[in-house]
From Swiss-Prot:
Function comment: Catalyzes the hydrolytic cleavage of the carbon-nitrogen bond in imidazolone-5-propanoate to yield N-formimidoyl-L-glutamate. It is the third step in the universal histidine degradation pathway.
Cofactor mode of binding and number, as noted: Binds 1 zinc or iron ion per subunit.
Binding sites annotated in the UniProt record for Zn(2+): H76, H78, H246, D320
Family from the record: Belongs to the metallo-dependent hydrolases superfamily. HutI family.
Binding site for N-formimidoyl-L-glutamate: Y148, N322, G324
Protein name in the entry: Imidazolonepropionase
Pathway: Amino-acid degradation; L-histidine degradation into L-glutamate; N-formimidoyl-L-glutamate from L-histidine: step 3/3
GO MF annotation list: imidazolonepropionase activity; iron ion binding; zinc ion binding
Subcellular location: Cytoplasm
């Protein structure tokens, strides 16, 4: 066996296995291989296991007793935007809720204005900085939503920029159309008029140019109600798009139930999800993407991860990186929040940010585990054990990132 790259002297590999989301107690099923190696060829994992006596490779990396885990997958971000919203924090400290700020023209709409006024180069430069931060902290694949354009022209522009970013960044980008992020100012008194615009103009144009794999809707009070969300997602499904839903974040909006009924790939947030929503999601195989960074930043209750897992749901974790409710690119910090605030175990968390996160963007057959045939997206982390990643919070534990791009594996030394 000859490899392009051999990583040897690995203290232990921790990885989930398979291509499908791990549900309930199966999230604890982590393969542990001591004194291990990983061989890579043409950007994919050729073999991984107990270190053999000898293996030939063009390039070798001595892991020096570090731990190897799959590259992190962030299944929920709003990467492409301009400006920031630190001015809103003072309002939140005074007791204003997110919906209050949204109704005053703040929140999403203020970022929409800043993004519309930014040039392509400005948006690319800002996004690339964030992608570099993500990669250095171990995120190798990221889902990116539009939603700060809220017009046909601007939404298409943002989706085109995602494709450009995917071609120039080492991080793999999975695009999601989120024209239904908020009602734009020009449709403030005619929300159904905007829904019609999404259905009759935006979705056909997105599909015509093949710009997005997923369609998402913010199903929430102050954004799109249940019937509006249902209509948009049903239309997207007719066009062959896979579905996602911002579900039950601030109120019990029925988003989880809608996700199950329509067979969405994921339902995200779920702080207020109903019992019926959980059952319908479970039957449909919908992944629940939890976003504890939002709960931290908004000082709101966290999603009940333990309940969702014990009910047999597949749970993933994401940053929800955005300028208003979760301004962080650091998935390791999110993992620590899940560990302490949502009572998830280290093994559940690893599954949630690798295989289950990959399945939440329909990439479980390509990434999310360290197995033969998967992309060589691998992290070497300088920690004594898996729990230590979450326990010693607020710092970057990643030493080296191995990132598959095309038919090559690129080695990035973080520190």
């Amino acid at each position: 066996m000859e490899a392009d790259l051999l990583i040897y002297n690995i203290k232990k590999i921790y990885t989930p296995l398979g291509n499908c989301p791990q549900c309930g107690s199966d999230m604890e099923n982590i393969e542990e291989i001591e004194d291990a190696y990983i061989a890579i060829k043409d950007g994919k994992i050729l073999a991984a296991g107990k270190s053999p006596a000898a293996i030939s490779a063009k390039e070798k990396i001595d892991a020096k007793g570090m731990i190897a885990i799959p590259g992190f997958v962030d299944p929920h971000t709003h990467l492409i935007h301009y400006g920031s919203r630190e001015n809103e924090v003072a309002l939140k400290l005074k007791g204003y809720c997110y919906v209050d700020i949204l109704k005053q023209g703040g929140g999403i709409l203020s970022t929409v204005n800043a993004t519309r006024n930014a040039s392509d180069d400005q948006l690319i430069e800002k996004a690339m900085k964030s992608l570099d931060i993500m990669l250095s902290h171990g995120t190798t694949t990221v889902e990116v939503k539009s939603g700060y354009g809220l017009s046909t022209e601007e939404e298409i522009r943002l989706l085109r920029l995602m494709n450009k970013l995917n071609s120039i960044s080492l991080v793999d980008i999975v695009p999601t159309f989120l024209g239904a992020h908020s009602i734009p100012t020009e449709f403030k008194e005619n929300s159904w008029g905007y829904v019609d615009k999404i259905i009759n103009e935006m979705i056909p144009k997105v599909k015509e140019e093949n710009l997005a794999e997923f369609c998402d809707v913010f199903c929430e009070d102050g954004a799109f109600d249940y019937e509006q969300s249902k209509k948009i997602l049903e239309e997207a499904k007719k066009y062959g798009m896979k579905l996602k839903i911002h579900a039950d974040e601030l109120t019990q909006s029925g988003g989880g139930e809608l996700a199950g009924i329509l067979g969405a790939v994921s339902a995200d947030h779920l702080e207020e999800v109903s019992e019926k929503g959980i059952e319908l999601m479970k039957k449909a195989g919908t992944v629940g993407v939890l976003l504890p960074g939002v709960s931290y930043f908004l000082d709101r209750p966290y999603a009940n991860a333990r309940k969702l897992i014990e009910k047999g749901l597949a749970v993933a974790l994401g940053t929800d990186y955005n300028p208003g409710t979760s301004p962080t690119e650091n998935l390791q910090l999110i993992m620590s929040f899940a560990y302490i605030k949502m009572k998830m175990s280290a093994k559940e968390i690893l599954t949630a940010v690798t295989l289950n996160a990959a399945c939440a963007i329909d990439r479980g057959n390509e990434i999310g585990t360290i197995e033969k045939g998967k992309k060589a997206d691998i992290l070497l982390i300088d920690v004594p054990n898996l729990d230590y990643v979450m326990y010693h919070f607020g710092i970057n534990h990643v030493n080296t990132v191995i990132k598959s791009k095309g038919d090559k594996a690129v080695v990035i030394g973080v520190r």
